[in-house]
Curated annotation (Swiss-Prot):
High affinity receptor for the C-C type chemokines CCL17/TARC, CCL22/MDC and CKLF isoform 1/CKLF1. The activity of this receptor is mediated by G(i) proteins which activate a phosphatidylinositol-calcium second messenger system. Can function as a chemoattractant homing receptor on circulating memory lymphocytes and as a coreceptor for some primary HIV-2 isolates. In the CNS, could mediate hippocampal-neuron survival. Residues 68-77, 134-150, 227-242, 309-360 are cytoplasmic. The lineage of its organism: Eukaryota, Metazoa, Chordata, Craniata, Vertebrata. It comes from Homo sapiens. Pfam families: 7tm_1. It is a multi-pass membrane protein. The gene is CCR4. This is C-C chemokine receptor type 4.
Length: 360
């Protein structure tokens, strides 16, 4: 139900043809405060997530290409998970502006941004699930994993995963539309009139593909991993499991509330739940859990840094390299100025190398 819509009534509409009488019809569920809440809090929160999510996941992509060079199936899955997070990040400026004002970007971007949102959602949880399967094969079926956990199979399964995510997101692309109502432009999913079937199918799709199936697979994988590690203690394996386990737990913790709230919203749309106070709280919950889900985009790089020793080493090397380039550029600028002022300068390359070495 649109927050600004007036509920249907069984009274004859002709009685209320007069404008003032029509406006005086009591609205069963006013939600102006909910929109004001979103206008105030969502744009700054989305901006923070955009900045930190973009920086963190860009660093992960750089590390994977520059240092790890995608040598294994795990590297391929980590790269694709970072790309999934970046899809969310790139959509946030649009949603932030939309929350503060209205949709001004047209129908094309409305469909594209909504589609990016869903593709990022599905692909993200699919790759977290694949990472759990990858750890399961590496630890529980170590011999078989030597043949199965190859770079080639990693690329093939990643392409298949993206295909499934894109296909699952098509309804969001097809049914997202722009419309203007009471001088306010919206970008929302609108189904045909009285079409409850699509609403139910959409909710079931998100909850089954986005929660039930992945959660079942992850629980199976980690129960078998824990069972195996009880008989085989290996410090490196334990650290790898901690990192992947943290990714899984945080993903479920940040996305499960949103899935539950979406399911409850569907029940409201189907008029299974009809209570004004409950609807208002549900709208607040949608904004809160959706923002919580977006925050997840920033967390995976932090997990890699604190739990992955190699990642921590590579990230520090990357920052040292960037710092060295920055210092080098500073010295290049100083050298040009100094050379222009004093043509007989004795500032040599070896001197600059020594200074750069000291800076690093």
């Amino acid at each position: 139900m649109n927050p600004t819509d007036i509920a249907d009534t069984t009274l004859d509409e002709s009685i209320y043809s007069n404008y003032y009488l029509y406006e005086s019809i009591p609205k069963p569920c006013t939600k102006e405060g909910i929109k004001a809440f979103g206008e105030l809090f969502l744009p700054p929160l989305y901006s923070l997530v955009f900045v930190f999510g973009l920086l963190g996941n860009s660093v992960v992509v750089l590390v994977l290409f520059k240092y790890k060079r995608l040598r294994s199936m795990t590297d391929v899955y980590l790269l694709n998970l970072a790309i999934s997070d970046l899809l969310f990040v790139f959509s946030l400026p649009f949603w932030g502006y939309y929350a503060a004002d209205q949709w001004v970007f047209g129908l094309g971007l409305c469909k594209m941004i909504s589609w990016m949102y869903l593709v990022g959602f599905y692909s993200g949880i699919f790759f977290v699930m694949l990472m759990s399967i990858d750890r399961y094969l590496a630890i529980v079926h170590a011999v078989f994993s030597l043949r199965a956990r190859t770079l080639t199979y990693g690329v093939i399964t990643s392409l298949a995963t993206w295909s499934v995510a894109v296909f699952a997101s098509l309804p969001g692309f097809l049914f997202s539309t722009c419309y203007t109502e009471r001088n306010h432009t919206y970008c929302k999913t609108k189904y045909s009139l009285n079409s409850t079937t699509w609403k139910v199918l959409s909710s079931l799709e998100i909850n089954i593909l986005g929660l039930v199936i992945p959660l079942g697979i992850m629980l199976f994988c980690y129960s078998m991993i824990i069972r195996t590690l009880q008989h085989c203690k290996n410090e490196k394996k334990n650290k790898a499991v901690k990192m992947i386990f943290a990714v899984v737990v945080l993903f479920l913790g940040f996305w499960t509330p949103y899935n539950i709230v979406l399911f409850l919203e569907t029940l409201v749309e189907l008029e299974v739940l009809q209570d004004c106070t409950f609807e208002r709280y549900l709208d607040y919950a949608i904004q809160a859990t959706e923002t919580l889900a977006f925050v997840h985009c920033c967390l995976n790089p932090i997990i890699y840094f604190f739990l992955g020793e190699k990642f921590r080493k590579y990230i520090l090397q990357l920052f040292k390299t960037c710092r060295g380039l920055f210092v080098l550029c500073q010295y290049c600028g100083l050298l040009q100025i100094y050379s222009a002022d004093t043509p007989s300068s004795s500032y040599t390359q070896s001197t600059m190398d020594h200074d750069l070495h000291d800076a690093l």
